Amino acid sequence: MLNHILLLVISLVCAALTLSWFPLLFRKQSYSCAKGLIVITGGSGILGHAIIQEALDRGFSVASLDSTEPASFLQYNSKFSALKCNITKDKDVEGCVHSLKKMNRTPFALINAAAIAPKNHLLSISRQELQKCFETNVIGQLAITSALFPLLLQDPNPHVVNIASSLAYFSAMGVGAYSSSKAALVSLHETLEEEVLSQHPNFKFSLYVLGQIKSTMFEKDTPNRVLAPLLEPQNLAKIIIQNLYTNKSGRFYYPFYARFMPLLRFFPLPIQKLARLFSGMDKIYS
């Protein structure tokens, strides 16, 4: 019991220090990655599309790995390449890596923006839906990261970007599959970062923990615009690309409330219930 209390105290202190010294979590160097190649998954999504457009506007080259066709106007941009790829299928992943090698394209950054969010209660969701969610949001992202890893290492400052959700820390009714997959992604990111940096200290990892984005993935509005404002995908894209441009990495939380979501887990259950009631988070997809 004493060990559990000590662990709780240490966790709270670490969380407080994280919030107090938040700016120190970022590693920034003078190296600029302008004109390099960015590989992105999920480019047909609202956020993925915004990231592609912002990257092209900033002078980067972009290779989009997606199972659907890109917007027609992107196909006429000489710096844009579209590779049809389902990241949940090993053959597709291997084929995309082979195509990049064949084109003599070496990426400096990978942005994992692919995600799906089934809406169903956990006792009602099918095994197939749950499996597809984890394959897309977790397993597939690790697969493409692993496959591109040798190519990324050819750049002096390689960078992997993963996009999580504030729901990974405090889930809501009706989106349990999505939330748990994003929680797994957070754990995967943290472990992968430590494993890679132990051997390749120049490698960069960035984790973006986001609230609700204006997109078709979560078409229903948030119940409390003051506490949980909707995020504009274009604004997020500017932040992500700017951080790549300046070689800044670390943990990024948007909007402001997202950085406090992990702390809710340490509060007594009645307080958590009040937070759910006050925010209305369980009413959206219940």
From Swiss-Prot:
CDD domains, alphabetized: 17beta-HSDXI-like_SDR_c
Family of this protein: Belongs to the short-chain dehydrogenases/reductases (SDR) family.
Main location: endoplasmic reticulum
Active-site residue numbers: 166, 178, 182
SUPFAM superfamilies per record: NAD(P)-binding Rossmann-fold domains
Transmembrane segments: 5-25, 36-56
InterPro entries per record: NAD(P)-bd_dom_sf (IPR036291), SDR_fam (IPR002347)
Binding site for NADP(+): 47, 67, 178, 182, 213, 215
Protein's name according to its UniProt entry: Uncharacterized oxidoreductase C16H5.14c
Keyword terms, alphabetized: Endoplasmic reticulum, Membrane, NADP, Oxidoreductase, Transmembrane, Transmembrane helix
Cellular-component GO terms for this entry: endoplasmic reticulum; endoplasmic reticulum membrane; mitochondrion
EC assignment: 1.-.-.-
Pfam families: adh_short
Keyword Transcription regulation: no
Membrane topology of the entry: Multi-pass membrane protein
MF (Gene Ontology): oxidoreductase activity
Domain of life (superkingdom): Eukaryota
Subcellular location per the Swiss-Prot or TrEMBL entry: Endoplasmic reticulum membrane
